[in-house]
């Protein structure tokens, strides 16, 4: 049986497209990056202490059921452990030097180790990223390439007091053919986004944008095909947080949704973050000893379903999940309306109507997913009849 229903297709209206935001505009079809959010916090669904040998865990990568991390001072080992327990293996990167390894990232072939910590004096001239093949790591015969960079807007004229520079960095993500780094600005608690190629060589890191974080960024990871970046960090009072960037256009990482989420693990110096699907993330904190407390290094599981599922798997201006049901999905983009459906709809006619019921467009569904240019549609509201197979 075919049951007809209606779906409103909006004209090209800019605004906040996230239903979870304070200022969500259901009529908006273009995300203009203005979404604001209520204060929110999450608690780890699971936390396990790490071995003492990884007291200064700094970066984190998830690869299947394995987590990879490293320390940030002198130690040249990569450490692999299961996300289910703390049994670990060490893989030394022979011939390398760890000045301040602060984060790691990966693509299909390589691990990338960011030796770019710069908080002690703010005047390093040897910022670099080491690139090593994953297969070489597992074979124990590691050789590495070097990617060197300098910030385009930094003029080095001497040293600064520790933890005062705006050119420290502890976070990076490999996205496409680029490395994206996020600075740790100690004075303003903002973060500048820089990019440069991921191929070995020497580069000037180009400044793309600045994020008003209100905290110190210490780790990053990305799911490029979902337009999603997760950042982690902490406040000066050691209140850890996540900072989510998502639904941004192209490589304009600052131009989409920006949401800060507190982590209910106070005084944990969170340093690394990783995810494989955006719904379950993982972070690590290094050992912290103060006069009034001692925090062990740990690995935390973070369920982000309530924060990101609607975006990742459906919803306005969101990325639809793979359609295996008898339903037609509609997604509005800047210049097109994307229509996708079950293969059983091939050969089915469709039509788009305005609110007066006039047929504006009609045709036949010839492919499982196709786009309709909106340039010939005047701004306004339209009705699109879709059917469900019952």
Language model: regions and residue ranges:
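Primarily marks secretory-pathway-exposed extracellular/lumenal segments that are disulfide-
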Residues: 7-38
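Disulfide-stabilized cysteine-rich extracellular repeat microdomains
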Residues: 21, 26-29, 33, 225, ...
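Short, polar loop/linker segments at the starts of domains and inter-domain junctions
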Residues: 23-31, 160-167, 340
């Amino acid at each position: 049986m075919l049951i007809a229903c209606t779906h409103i297709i909006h004209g090209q209206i800019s605004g906040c497209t996230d239903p979870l935001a304070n200022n969500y505009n259901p009529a908006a079809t273009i995300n203009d990056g203005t979404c604001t959010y209520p204060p929110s916090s999450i608690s780890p669904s699971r936390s396990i202490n790490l071995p003492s040998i990884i007291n200064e865990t700094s970066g984190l990568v998830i690869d299947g059921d394995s987590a990879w991390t490293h320390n940030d001072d002198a130690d040249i080992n990569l450490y692999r452990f299961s996300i289910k327990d703390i049994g670990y293996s060490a893989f030394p990167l022979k011939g390398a030097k760890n000045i301040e390894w602060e984060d790691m990232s990966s693509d299909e072939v390589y691990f990338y180790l960011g030796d770019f910590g710069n908080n002690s004096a703010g005047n390093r001239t040897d910022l670099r990223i080491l690139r090593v093949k994953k297969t070489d790591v597992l074979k124990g015969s590691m050789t590495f390439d070097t990617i060197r960079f300098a910030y385009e807007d930094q003029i080095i004229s001497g040293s600064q007091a520790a933890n005062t520079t705006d050119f420290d960095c502890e976070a990076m993500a490999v996205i496409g053919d680029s490395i994206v780094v996020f600075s740790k600005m100690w004075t303003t608690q903002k973060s500048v986004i820089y990019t440069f190629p991921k191929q070995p060589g020497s580069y000037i890191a180009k400044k793309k944008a600045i994020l008003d974080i209100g905290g110190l960024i210490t780790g990053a990871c990305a799911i490029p095909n979902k337009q999603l970046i997760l950042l982690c960090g902490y406040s000066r009072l050691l209140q850890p947080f996540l900072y989510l960037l998502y639904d941004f256009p192209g490589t304009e990482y600052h131009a989409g949704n920006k949401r800060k989420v507190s982590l209910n693990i106070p005084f944990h110096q969170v340093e690394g973050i990783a995810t494989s699907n955006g719904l379950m993330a993982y972070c690590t904190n290094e050992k912290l000893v103060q006069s009034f407390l001692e925090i062990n290094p740990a690995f935390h599981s973070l369920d982000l379903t309530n924060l990101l599922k609607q975006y990742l798997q459906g919803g306005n201006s969101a990325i639809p999940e793979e359609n295996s049901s008898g339903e037609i999905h509609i997604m509005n983009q800047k210049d097109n309306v994307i229509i996708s459906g079950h293969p059983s709809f091939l050969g089915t006619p469709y039509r788009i109507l305005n609110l007066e019921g006039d047929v504006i467009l009609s045709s036949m569904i010839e492919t499982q997913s196709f786009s309709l240019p909106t340039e010939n549609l005047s701004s306004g509201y339209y009705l699109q009849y879709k059917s469900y197979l019952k």
